[in-house]
């Protein structure tokens, strides 16, 4: 690299020298260039007559102070320094930018034929010179000018206050947002769309116009997004007492977008993946994803916009809290157990892996080179688990009291994680001093639990030891405050009430010490403990369960999550044992009692179908890899495929009967219908490994009247490498080649194809008319699937998978480093593999590091991996 990027540290935070109270923006949009005029009201905050503004890839055309041309300034690579300033002044900055050439998709850029923006975290500095930091909150007025025929819709934040015509076929619209906000929440869209309109009346009677803008021809795919938005608004009023505060709420769906969606005040910009759906183009998973993401961005209106972050190190303040809120929304509207299982799979798989990687960081990071790299599973998902632990410790009533106090203290300001914890502590009276360590300590704690039963005194003891391994960013670890939710069962399945010192005690144990013993009285027989119910803390659990105890919990646990977890622990025992067997050249085995336990689940008539589907799903290769300090990629893959084949063979009759019973003639996204489809397709995924697999999969594909069943058939054919795979893939491509979003599913299957020839398949797919490396969705679908969901081929000992990844990353480095940075993660953990693979991956990382123009996004990750 030409120069080494500098890190920023959380503890170096300084308030800004100046603040901006109001900004008036005018955008003159042309296809080859855009002129931006920014008129800001600036106030000195500290003794300084020098103002340093952020700015990147800008051409400065004019600079005025109080209407006069200003000469005392200098332009740096990423800043504008203005000197000799009065304490209060009007600053006018005119910049020229080229959205058409902006492939990084940060700031103002073109997506298809439309102009749109992405300003979080630091994109506004690519639009104009500004104090681009979240603790500078200004009121925005925005005028957008463009050609009327090409761009009939001109949108920005807030409420529309004026519009008019200009000569030469141009027109303008003026927007005003009365709520002060940081620059990252600014948004602008100009284009020609189809619009779905509705309205919502808030609990206080405010009429809110709802508008969803989609590409022409996609109006019939916007209905579910609108339903989800209305459900979100109603839910936030009912559960949190929070209502919307503008007269209009707009969502725009765009095809070129680095993230999932963005909560800009009053004008959300969404990746079209999280807006567009009908039964022909979207799966049940897509429908549920849209509901969750629409909810997430709407909930940010209070947790993120009304109260924002003081600095980017506090990102989890808005994201951890809002993920918790969107998870609760999905759980209240759907199946709480199934949603919880989905959340936990993410934590136990990729988030635990992130904790163990060279990029490990606490949910409130201390050191950052490129902020985009910290939009992570740790900050978001683990951040949400930290909020959930507070909810567990406080209970719903006190938690809501804490939320109200938080808004009372901080509405309209930029706050910190500490502010949130203090509000929870003060409102509840519960001491969270030790709990705060969750914000500053990285890594995954392990809880080692052992038990002793004393028959004479009828007492039962649980001894809990907690330990967090040193991580790449922190060597010293302290004991955390961990809520451990437990239940004890008598051998007949009855729940044993927890008592200590003659009094009832809570199911949630406060684990605070490195080693702690909890003693329970009046336990008349040796009990079976259900531990870490609801995954009450993001930790690894070690307890020496017997097969019989786990099978007992699969049947008797009152809590559905605990039943699922017992099944997962049972599978984990056999996966570990069989990995060792395979390494010693022995065949994979599964005990009859385990097969019978899963047969019982399949035949159970008192369990929700969607929950049964989860019970029957094996842990992923990525999750299993996380159990090992040295990963044997091939042995794990062989064991998982063999276990699936054994279960398919042994349970073929039951799977087949269930599959045929669950057929539905009409498609509906009611949760019961989704559950039946999910279980039916899990049965198909097993039956694909039996003699009837090929015929069954072909028949389902031919008869499918919805995308869920279509993709389930194709996935089964892909994973089991059935003879019909090629014809199904060909047929799908012919049908959908003109729809990039629908083709993403096809690209994902091509990238995850287990065939040893997969790289040839991927190279061919990259030539497909629907593919473009410039489109993040296409790239994530094809390349991301290969890197993250095709472990055997990605880690092929020839090194060709690594070389392919390196080639793609070098290409993306200059066009879209943010997408490159997301894709590189599987390479960072190279020390988990054998020496041959380590050397091959290291070679690719070193080639990247040696690039002259290596982007900060990649530099930070590559450097940490090589130093680890």
Please tell me what each predicted stretch does.
Residues 97-104, 469-470, 535-541:
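Short acidic/polar inter-strand loop motif in beta-rich domains
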Residues 49, 59-66, 431-434, 444-531, ...:
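Beta-strand-rich binding/interaction modules
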Residues 45-47, 51, 55-111, 510-526:
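A surface-exposed beta-strand-loop module
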């Amino acid at each position: 690299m030409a120069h080494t990027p500098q890190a920023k540290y959380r503890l170096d935070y300084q308030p800004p020298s100046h603040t901006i109270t109001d900004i008036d923006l005018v955008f003159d949009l042309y296809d080859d260039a855009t002129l931006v005029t920014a008129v800001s009201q600036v106030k000195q905050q500290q003794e300084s007559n020098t103002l340093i503004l952020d700015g990147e890839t800008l051409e400065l055309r004019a600079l005025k102070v109080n209407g006069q041309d200003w000469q005392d300034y200098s332009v740096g690579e990423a800043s504008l320094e203005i000197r000799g300033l009065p304490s209060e002044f009007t600053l006018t900055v005119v910049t020229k930018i080229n959205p058409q050439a902006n492939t990084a998709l940060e700031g103002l850029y073109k997506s298809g034929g439309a102009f749109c923006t992405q300003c979080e975290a630091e994109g506004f500095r690519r639009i104009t010179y500004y104090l681009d930091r979240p603790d500078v909150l200004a009121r925005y007025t925005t005028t957008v000018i463009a050609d009327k025929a090409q761009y009939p819709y001109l949108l920005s934040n807030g409420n529309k206050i004026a519009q008019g015509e200009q000569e030469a076929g141009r027109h303008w619209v003026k927007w005003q947002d009365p709520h002060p906000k940081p620059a990252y929440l600014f948004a602008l869209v100009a284009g020609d769309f189809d619009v779905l309109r509705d309205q919502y009346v808030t609990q206080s009677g405010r009429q809110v116009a709802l508008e969803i803008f989609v590409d022409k021809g996609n109006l019939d795919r916007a209905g579910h997004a609108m339903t989800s938005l209305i459900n979100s608004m109603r839910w936030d009023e009912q559960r949190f007492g929070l209502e919307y505060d503008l007269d209009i709420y707009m969502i725009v769906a765009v095809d070129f977008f680095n993230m999932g969606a963005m909560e800009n005040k009053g004008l959300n910009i969404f990746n079209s993946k999280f807006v567009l759906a009908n039964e022909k183009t979207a799966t049940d998973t897509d429908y549920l994803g849209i509901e969750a993401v629409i909810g997430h961005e709407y909930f940010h209106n209070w947790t993120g916009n009304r109260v924002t972050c003081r600095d980017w190190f506090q990102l989890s303040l808005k994201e951890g809290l809002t993920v918790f809120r969107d998870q609760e929304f999905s759980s209240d509207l759907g199946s709480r157990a199934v949603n919880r299982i989905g959340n936990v799979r993410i934590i136990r798989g990729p988030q635990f892996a992130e904790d163990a990687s060279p990029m490990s960081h606490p949910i409130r990071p201390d050191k950052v080179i490129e902020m985009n790299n910290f939009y992570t599973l740790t900050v978001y998902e683990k951040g949400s688990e930290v909020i959930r632990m507070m909810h567990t410790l406080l209970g719903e009533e006190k938690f809501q009291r804490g939320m109200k106090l938080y808004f009372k203290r901080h509405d309209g300001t930029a706050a910190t994680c500490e502010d949130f914890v203090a509000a929870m502590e003060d409102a509840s009276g519960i001491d969270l001093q030790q709990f705060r360590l969750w914000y500053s300590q990285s890594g995954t704690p392990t809880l080692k639990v052992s038990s002793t039963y004393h028959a004479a005194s009828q007492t039962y003891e649980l001894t809990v030891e907690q330990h967090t391994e040193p991580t790449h960013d922190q060597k010293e670890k302290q004991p955390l405050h961990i809520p451990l939710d437990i239940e004890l069962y008598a051998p007949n399945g009855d729940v044993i009430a927890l008592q200590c010192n003659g009094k009832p005690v809570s199911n949630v144990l406060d684990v605070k010490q490195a080693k702690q013993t909890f003693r329970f009285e009046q336990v008349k027989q040796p009990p079976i403990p259900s531990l870490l119910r609801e995954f009450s803390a993001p930790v690894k659990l070690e307890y020496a369960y017997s097969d019989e105890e786990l099978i007992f919990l699969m049947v008797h646990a009152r809590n559905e999550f605990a039943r699922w977890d017992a099944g997962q622990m049972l599978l984990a025992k056999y996966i570990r044992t069989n990995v060792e067997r395979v390494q010693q050249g022995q065949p994979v085995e599964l005990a009859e009692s385990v097969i019978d336990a899963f047969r019982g689940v399949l035949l159970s008539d008192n369990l929700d179908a969607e929950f049964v589907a989860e019970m029957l799903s094996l842990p992923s290769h990525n999750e299993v890899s996380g159990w090992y300090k040295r990963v044997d990629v091939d042995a794990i893959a062989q064991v998982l495929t063999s276990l699936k084949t054994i279960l398919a063979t042994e349970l073929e009759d039951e799977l087949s009967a269930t599959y045929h019973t669950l057929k539905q003639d009409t498609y509906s996204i009611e949760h019961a219908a989704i559950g039946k489809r999910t279980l039916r397709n899990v049965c198909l995924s097993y039956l694909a490994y039996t003699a009837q697999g090929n015929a069954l999969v072909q028949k389902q594909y031919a008869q499918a009247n919805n995308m869920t069943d279509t993709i389930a058939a194709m996935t089964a054919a892909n994973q089991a490498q059935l003879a019909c795979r090629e014809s199904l893939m060909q047929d799908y491509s012919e049908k959908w080649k003109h729809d990039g979003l629908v083709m993403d599913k096809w690209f994902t299957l091509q990238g995850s194809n287990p065939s040893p020839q997969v790289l040839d398949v991927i190279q061919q797919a990259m030539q497909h008319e629907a593919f473009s490396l410039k489109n993040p969705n296409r790239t994530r679908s094809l390349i991301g699937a290969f890197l993250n969901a095709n472990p055997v081929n990605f880690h092929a000992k020839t090194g060709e998978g690594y070389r392919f990844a390196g080639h793609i990353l070098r290409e993306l480095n200059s066009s879209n480093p943010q997408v490159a940075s997301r894709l590189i993660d599987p390479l960072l953990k190279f020390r988990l593999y054998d020496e041959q693979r380590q050397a091959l991956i290291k070679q690719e990382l070193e080639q990247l590091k040696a690039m002259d123009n290596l982007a900060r996004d990649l530099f930070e990750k590559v450097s940490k991996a090589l130093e680890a």
